[in-house]
C-alpha cells in the first residue's frame, strides 16, 4: 500500500463490505494488504463468523460470552472442518491424471419445499447426483418410509435454525454426507433418526429431538454446533468420531454411548479427521502458576554416635576422668542447677509429691551435663513445620510442598503424556451435558477422550466399564445426583486437570479392578466423599487438590488398593483419608491438613501403608486407628492437630514407626480400649456403595496379594518415633491388649512422657529416650502389667518413674536428673527394680511410699545433694526386699560420675529389627532441649474426638 494513500481507518471501512472470497483474494496482494485483512479480526471477521448459518459462537455452549482469541482463526477452523466431507471426491475419479483434463462437473442445487422443484426430501434424493446440494426451505417435512442415502449429498436447511424440521429415519449407505441447519425428529415408525455403518457423516448446526443416532465402525462422524434434546448418540466400534461445541439436554438415558474397541478397518475420512484434530489448537494445558514444585523427600543418613552422661559438682571434673565442657557437634547439653527451673505444675497427690524446693538447700550448685544423640524418624515431609505453631497465624506451606502443574506432571510422566496426546475412538470437546440422566457411557473396550466439557445437573457425568479407557482433560463436573466419574470392571485411563465439585456422591468412584490415573484435579465441596476406591479397585491418585468435602477426601474400602501420593487433602468435614472394611493402599507424600475429623482414619480391617505424609492442623486427631485397624504408619509428620497425634484402639494392630509427632493439643500417641459402638452416634451414616440399589458382595472378590512392604505383626507396635511438645502425655495407654513401645524419643511433652492407666496384658516399654517432660517421665497406675527395660529417663520435671502397677518390671534403665525422685513406688504396687542406674538432684533415688511389694536388686543409685539420703522408705515394709544395690555418695566436690559400661541408655542401635532395620539408613538426630513454654491444650477424654467416620 503506497504512502500517501487512503488512511488505514478508511481502508478498513471499505474492506468491511467485502465477502469472504474477496477478502481471501485481497490478502494475497501483498504483505501490507495481508496485515490489513488480519486487522479486521474484531470487525469483519467477527461479523462473518456470527452471521454464518452453519456455525455458532466459537465458545458456544459453555462460554458464549467469552470472545475467542481470534475470530478469523475460529472462522477458518470451522470452514476447514465443514469441507471434510468432500475430501474423498478425487477418490471417485478413475484416474487422477485424466481428472486434470476432464471438465469438472458442476454441483447442482435441488430445492425442496412448497412451490419449489421437489415436495419432499425423498423425491429430491431420487434425482440427486454425487455431491449435489439439497436445500430444504422453511417448513416441516415428514417422510413415511426409511430413506436410504446411496450417493454423497449435502442437505441444508434454508433460513434460521428451527425453521426447517425433518421427521425421518435415514440410513446412509454412501461414503459421505453432510447435514446442516436442520431440526431432526424421529419418524412415527422408528426412533432412529440417522444411521451409518461404513460412511462418514457430518452434522453442522442441527437440533436433534427425542430420537437416536447410530454410527457403526468403520463409519465415522463429525458433529459441531448441534443440540441434542433427549437424544441418544450411539457409537459402536468407531475408529474416530468428533463431537465439538454441542449441547446435550434432558436425556432419559446416556447422552453418548461409546461401545466396543475402535475398529481396525478405517474408512477414507479417518486420516482427514485425525489431521483436523492435530491441526486444531492444542488443548493440552499450559503451565499453571498455582501449582509449583514437586516434593523432594530425599533422606539423609546420620552417623551413630555414643551417648554420654556425666554428673559433676560445681563444674569441677576429675583429672583422671576428663569431661568436655562443650557439647559435641550435633549434640545438646542440658544443665540443671539446685535451684533450677521451677516445676510449672506440681505433680498430683497420687504421684506422691515433690520435696519442698526450699528445704535444706545447699549453697553449692549441683549440675549435670547430659549429651546424647539418638535415632528418630528419617527426614520428614514438612520439616519447616517442626517449630511451635503460631496462634492465629495463617498456614503457609513451604515451596517444596506446593503442587506441580498438570503441564509439569505430564512432562515428568511419559505414559501420562502419551495418554493425554492419544486420539482414539470418540473425541468429545467443548460440549455441554446438562439436566439429564447420564453424560458419556464408555463400555466393552471402548475408547473416549473428553476435553473442556461441562457436565452439570446429571445423575452421573461419565461411566467407564468393561476394560474401557477414557481420557478426561479440563472438564467441569458438578451437581451430579450420584458420582461424577464412575469406573468399574477394569476401566481405566487418565483423569487430569478436571474441576469436580458439588456432587451428591463421590467425585470419582473406582471399583472392581479399575485402574485409572487421577492427576492434578480439583475435587471439592462434594456432599459425600471426594474419591472412593472399593471392590478391588486400584488407581494412581496423584497431585490432586481434594478439599471441603462432606465426608472423607479419599475413602478406601472393600479391598480397594490405590496409590495415593502427592495430594493436598484439606478442610474436609470428616476425615482426610479413611481406610475401612479391609481397604489397603499406599498413601505417601500427601499434605493432609485442617480436616474436621482424623487426618487419616483406619478401622475395620483397613491395612494401608501410610508413609511420609504431612498430617497437620486438624481439628481432631492426626491419625485414628479404630477397631481392628491395621497397617504401617511410617515416616509421617503429625503436627499441630488439636486432638492426639495418633489415636489407637487396643483392638487394632498398627505398626507406628519413624514418625515425627509434635505440637498436638492432647496426647502424642494414645491407646484406648473403648469399642467404637460406645461412641455417641456410632459410626454415623454409611455411604451407599451399591450400584442401582443392589447389594454388592465384595467379599467374593478378594485378591490375595503378598505385599513385601508390610511385615505381619501380632502386637501393636510403636517404635522409633519422635514424640515431642504435645499438650498432654507423649504416650497414653488405656489398653486391654498387649502393646510394645520401643526406641522412641519422647521429649518435652506437656504432661508425663508415658502414662499407663490400664494394661491388663503386658505393655513393653523398651529402649526409649524420655526426657524434659513437664511432669514425670513414666507413670504406671494400679493393676497394670508393664515392663520398662533399657530406657533413658532424663531431666523430667516430676519423678523419673512412678508406679503402683501390679507386676511392673523396671529393668536396666538410666533414670537420671529428674526433678522428683528417680523411682517412686506407691502403695499396693508390685514391682521388680533390677540393674538400673538412678539419680535425682533434689529428691531420693528411690522413694517407697506405704506398703509396697518390691524387689530392688543390683541397682546403682547415685546421691543427689549431699544432705539427702539415697533411699527413702515411709513405713517398715518387710515385703520390700533390697539386695546387692550399689549406693554412690559424693566424697568431695570434684567427684565425677560417668555412665559407662554400658554407655548411657537407650541403646537404640540394638533395638532395631525387622522392617525397621531395612530403613536404618533413614535417621535423624533428635536432641533433648529444655521446654520453655507450656503447650496449650486440655486433656483427652477416653475416646478420640470425632473418631467415627461416615
UniProtKB/Swiss-Prot annotation:
Biased composition (Basic and acidic residues): 330-342
One of the GO BP terms on file: regulation of apoptotic process
Ranges for region Disordered: 313-364
Subcellular location, principal: cytoplasm
Segments of skewed composition (Low complexity): 347-357
Pathway noted in the entry: Protein modification; protein ubiquitination
PbH1 repeats: 198-217, 238-260, 423-444, 467-489, 490-512, 513-535, 536-558, 559-581, 582-604, 605-627, 628-650, 651-673, 713-735, 736-758, 760-782, 783-805, 828-850
Signal peptide segment: none
Distribution of this protein across tissues and organs: Particularly highly expressed in B-cells.
Location relative to the cell: Cytoplasm
Gene Ontology CC entries for this record: cytoplasm
Statement: the UniProt record of this protein carries the keyword Translocase: no
Designated name of the protein: F-box only protein 10
Native source organism of the sequence: Mus musculus (Mouse)
Gene for this chain: Fbxo10
